[in-house]
Amino acid sequence: MRLWPVFIVSVLFHAYAGLRLLPALSGDAWGLFGPTWPVRTLAAVLVVSALSIPLGLLGHRLGRQPFAELAMRALTWVGLLCMGFFSSLMMLTLLRDAALTAWWGAGVAGFQASALTAGEAARLSASAVPLLAAAVTLWGFVNARRTAAVVRVDVPLVGLPLALQGFTLAQISDIHVGPTIRRHYLRRIVQRVNSLDADVVAVTGDLIDGSVAELAHQVAPLADLQSRHGTFFVTGNHEYYSGAHAWIKELRRLGLTVLMNEHVVIEQAIRSGEGSSSGAPAPSGMSASLVLAGVTDFHAAHFDPAHRSDPADALAGAPPGLPRVLLAHQPRSADAALRAGFDLQLSGHTHGGQFWPWNLFVPLQQPFTAGLNRLESLWVYTSSGTGYWGPPKRFGAPSEITLIRLVAA
């Protein structure tokens, strides 16, 4: 990856923001000689941000060399924080430009009711933009770094056997262990998942951002995940960026079952004290089974043709008539899952947009952004993700650990 184009793009975008905001704050044509500390502070922040974003990307690369790891990780943190701040600053600057244009147009047309002069409106809005961007970034950082909350979702399935009433799947997705998400962050997630006492733990991809050599120690807490029937994993696109074959081997070593276009049949005995919907006690020893399948990432074939994602293949040889649950990283697998005959698909990938305004663009690529949705007879639950990617920032799309409970329709 060549970084000089990133430097050029970063400088150009920051220059635009500076030229739109600094003159309004300072009163001079270029906004560089304002006497007030807000002008100097914003100018300094823009310079640091313009340099830190590409240097942060460079730091992620050089951090692979042990001698530079701590310094480069610090540089990566600064760069990603600046990226989060500037993304909000840039969008708010563009919205400010649009609002001022509309305000000016209303005045020309004779509809302006505000007592503010053009200079006052420009100065007040230029002051508000960086303050609002900083507030959003700070709140987003707090949201991103705290342990994901548990979201409980009931999914009604037609003909669900009595022994599967209340069957639970704890879903975690898109943790992105890497430069800023480390072992202690993952350990907190594991502890919260274990407290749910789920029947199954499902990890729906994008677990890591880095190689096994870099991150094996950081993902070790996954070995402590506990559930009645085990932990199941499917690959996401980021596993393929980071060496999917090595990660599949490592996760299996940790005790996870990696489903590569394949399925398992899970038999569930009725829980003690449960009865039928009429209130009568259930017969002793009653049990039922469900099919839990998993597919490789939607785009896995771009990296390895042998990993082509195929929900139909994942069901090959499965017993007929059982409830069928699919783990698929991207919601885009839903069409194929519907054709294959699944009842429920658990996905991630979207992060729920992670922070505004990126949530507005998710529908351009994926059929669902977040939450429980229906595609004809198929239920699709899309997790907003348990970690984050890139900037440590979540705003309007909180991270989650999802506890899916199957109930009779």
Question: Which residues make up each language-model segment?
Answer:
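Soluble catalytic domains of enzymes that build or remodel membrane lipids, polysaccharides, and related
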Residues: V151-R152, P156-A409
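Non-catalytic terminal accessory segments
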Residues: M1-R146
